[in-house]
């Protein structure tokens, strides 16, 4: 029995230092055509694929560093958004993608994001917002996207007791840039 206690103590120490394998449940959310499925395929297979809109939720197992994630890619069209709530129980993080090149839909994205922030079930769940498609000529700057989404005061690397961790990262899934930093940031809260 004492050996198991010692093992548990050692595991707890390693876990507190972030050195033990962790497992998390992530939801990939955002409006349709933001790049959720493309990102998931890039993380899983390290390549782009020609994809159709996501009509049905899909699940994948991913490993990023020492953390294993069960990811759920939920469609972003209006009908699919009604199903998002079914996946909230036991979620450890939300990855919310926004098409940074589609400024006409920023308000719609902000409404959905604000609605998610108001859900009591998610009050302590960390959110990483990815401003995707920064390689597109019409993409806005990080400052413009933060203003459009009402994310001028995010938590960054600070851990503030009682405050949900939220951070915005700009990325281009097709250019393979920006999103790994976002997952590294998110992993510290899982």
UniProtKB/Swiss-Prot annotation:
The keyword Hydrolase is annotated on this UniProt entry: yes
Q: SUPFAM superfamilies given for it?
A: P-loop containing nucleoside triphosphate hydrolases
Question: Which reaction is recorded as catalysed by this protein?
Answer: GTP + H2O = GDP + phosphate + H(+)
Keywords, sorted A to Z: Cytoplasmic vesicle, Endoplasmic reticulum, ER-Golgi transport, Golgi apparatus, GTP-binding, Hydrolase, Membrane, Nucleotide-binding, Protein transport, Transport
* Binding site residues for GTP: 30-37, 73-76, 132-135
Q: Write out the GO biological process terms.
A: endoplasmic reticulum membrane organization; endoplasmic reticulum to Golgi vesicle-mediated transport; intracellular protein transport; membrane organization; mitochondrial fission; mitochondrial membrane organization; nuclear envelope organization; positive regulation of ER to Golgi vesicle-mediated transport
PROSITE patterns assigned to the protein according to its UniProt record, in alphabetical order: SAR1
* Catalytic activity, EC: 3.6.5.-
Tagged with keyword Ubl conjugation: no
The record, for CDD domains, names:
Sar1 (cd00879)
Q: Which GO terms describe its cellular component?
A: COPII vesicle coat; endoplasmic reticulum exit site; endoplasmic reticulum membrane; Golgi membrane; mitochondria-associated endoplasmic reticulum membrane contact site; mitochondrion
What's the family? Belongs to the small GTPase superfamily. SAR1 family.
Q: Which PANTHER family match?
A: RE74312P
Role of this protein: Small GTPase component of the coat protein complex II (COPII) which promotes the formation of transport vesicles from the endoplasmic reticulum (ER). The coat has two main functions, the physical deformation of the endoplasmic reticulum membrane into vesicles and the selection of cargo molecules. SAR1 controls the coat assembly in a stepwise manner. Activated SAR1-GTP binds to membranes first and recruits the SEC23/24 complex. These SEC23/24-SAR1 prebudding intermediates are then collected by the SEC13/31 complex as subunits polymerize to form coated transport vesicles.
Complex formation: COPII is composed of at least 5 proteins: the SEC23/24 complex, the SEC13/31 complex and SAR1.
Per its record, how is this protein called by name? Small COPII coat GTPase SAR1
Taxonomy of origin reads:
Eukaryota, Fungi, Dikarya, Ascomycota, Saccharomycotina
